[in-house]
Amino acid sequence: MASHSRDSNGHDTAVVVAHEIYGVNEHISGVAKMLRPYRCDVFTPGFLPSGVVYAREDESEAYRQFTRTPGVAGMGNALAQYAEGLRERYRRVLCIGFSVGATSTWLASGTGAVDGAVCFYGSRIRDHLDIQPTAPCLVIFAEQEPSFSVPAITERLVDRKGVVTEVHPCRHGFCDPGSPHYSAVHSRQAWTSATRFLGLSR
């Protein structure tokens, strides 16, 4: 499994960034770069076979291959194992996931592997509402999701212990500068919410 981290600077916090169907692309690398000023070490493991990275125009192929392997459940298990492997070196292990990476983060949050999680527009969380995170979890949705009702899902999560939901008036992918749905304003707002929720400081 491919993995990248910054050189350790004596930080006691690790942040794992979980990728979308495309793998560790420029968006995920950009997220890692944004985290550099914070007091943490950043990891961007690749969970696709052979560390492959798909271009955005290959979305259909990327989706087809992802559903074949590792799939959401498989990525969730691999992510939990990866996070557990960091515990020997870090007091806190946090996870930030996007899209399928967000749903995988949601699954991992129910295993005790992470100490805090942020899930950016994990649309398939709706298929795993039986999960009870064992650590604080912020679930950020785009208001405009064509495949499901965001209010219906947030209503199911509102009384869930340790779970906070946040909805932005945007479309799926609004935090990705390379997406046609990118919103600089709401991306900045969501990022501020995420770092505060995880207790990350500069």
Question: Where are the predicted features?
Answer:
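Alpha/beta-hydrolase fold nucleophile elbow
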Residues: 87-98
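Gly/Ala-rich beta-loop-alpha elbow adjacent to hydrolase catalytic centers
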Residues: 97-101, 105
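Acidic catalytic loop of the alpha/beta-hydrolase fold
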Residues: 143-148, 156
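Serine-hydrolase catalytic machinery in alpha/beta-hydrolase-like enzymes
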Residues: 1-88, 176
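Short beta-to-alpha linker loops that shape the active-site pocket of alpha/beta-hydrolase fold enzymes
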Residues: 46-51, 123, 170-171
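A conserved short beta-strand
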Residues: 113-123
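Short beta-strand/loop motif that positions the catalytic acidic residue
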Residues: 133, 139-141
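C-terminal catalytic histidine-bearing segment of alpha/beta-hydrolase fold enzymes
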Residues: 164-202
